[in-house]
Structure formats: structure tokens, C-alpha cells
Amino acid sequence: MATFQAHFFAAVMCVGVLGLSKLCGADSCEYPDCVFTGLPRSSGVERYILLLNIIEVPDDIQQQCDILIQRAHNCTSQRTGCSRRVEESYDRRFYDGAYVMYLLDLGVYVCGHLSQLLDLKNCFTPKLQESVQSCINAAYNIQCLLDQYDQKNNCPPNTDDYFHTLVNNWLANNPYLGTGADRD
């Protein structure tokens, strides 16, 4: 059941949040150029989570996930072992199958924990956001992120756990961590 849910939510993210609907039918990590034509420079997952723009998470994100779930009924995800294809240019990172799969998995996590994300948004202040974002400079300084958050937040304990998991289990595993291609 857990595997089905993982595939289902990967399909959900495939269809909507990332705008990569053609990936749903891809049989390998060799994605054709047309898949990426017209793709926004930053996906929602990148904009709000990877860059820690927590206070800008849209209020209707739950509604967006509900719509994505409906769309996912017509999409079968193809989970493949994507090899690394590190792209030095930020614009070309979507040609790296491992990065695309990372974003899909991160989107699954975010969609599966929306209540915690919204709780985090409710206690995040502009000052806290600025403090944690100061720890991102071509790479994540994981200890700085955790320290800045722990020193400057008024968030409930469950939100603290969510932020720590997001940083330790997701941001720390960004395939573009430290490559210089992980920021606009």
C-alpha cells in the first residue's frame, strides 16, 4: 500500500506542481527537450521549499493538491533509476533525471504533510525567513539553518520537528547542493 501511495503521489506531482506532465509517460531518464519547453524557471517546490520562502506558500495549496490528485487518475508514474547528469547551468537542471526525481519525491513529502507546512507558515515571520535564508549561499549550511531556526522561532514543537526533518532529510539531500546551480 505504501508503494502504491508513493507512486500515486509521484504521479500527482508529475502532473501538476512541477508542470512535467510528459514525464508521466516517460520510460527512462532520457527526457526529450519538449518536456521542458515552457517550464517556469522555478517550480513551486523549488520556490517555497528549497529556497525556504515559507511565508509565501499559497493559502490554497491544499486545494491545489486536491486538484492534482484528481488529475493523477489519468497518469501512471514511471519510477526509474535516474543517473546523475549534473548540469552547471541553473536553467538546465531539469535535464538531470536525478534532480527531477528528487523534486517529485520532495513534492510527495510536502503534499503528504500539508498541515505541518501550513503550521510552519503560520509561525514563520519575515525576520525568521530572512535569518534562515542567510544560511543559503550556493549551498545549504545545514547547521546554520537549524541554529537560526531554533534561536528565532516561536513555533510549536510539531512544527519544529517538521522543519528539522525538511532540512536534515530533504534540503541536505538536494542533488545540486553545493554545485552553484541550485539558486536563481
Curated annotation (Swiss-Prot):
Signal sequence, start to end: 1-26
Keyword DNA damage: no
Location in the cell: Secreted
SS bond partners: C29-C34, C65-C111, C75-C82, C123-C155, C135-C144
Tissue occurrence: Highly expressed in atrium. Moderately expressed in the pericardium, pulmonary vein, nephridium, arteria anterior, ovotestis and connective tissue. Low expression found in intestine, lung plexus, diaphragm, subesophageal ganglion, ventricle and digestive gland. Very low expression found in columellar retractor, pedal nerves and cerebral ganglion. Not expressed in hemocytes.
Principal place of residence: secreted
Carbohydrate-modified residues: N74
Keyword annotations: Disulfide bond, Glycoprotein, Secreted, Signal
GO cellular component terms, semicolon-separated: extracellular region
Top-rank lineage group of the source organism: Eukaryota
Tagged with keyword Secreted: yes
Post-translational modification: N-glycosylated.
Protein name as catalogued: Cysteine-rich atrial secretory protein
Annotated source species: Achatina achatina
Lineage: Eukaryota, Metazoa, Spiralia, Lophotrochozoa, Mollusca
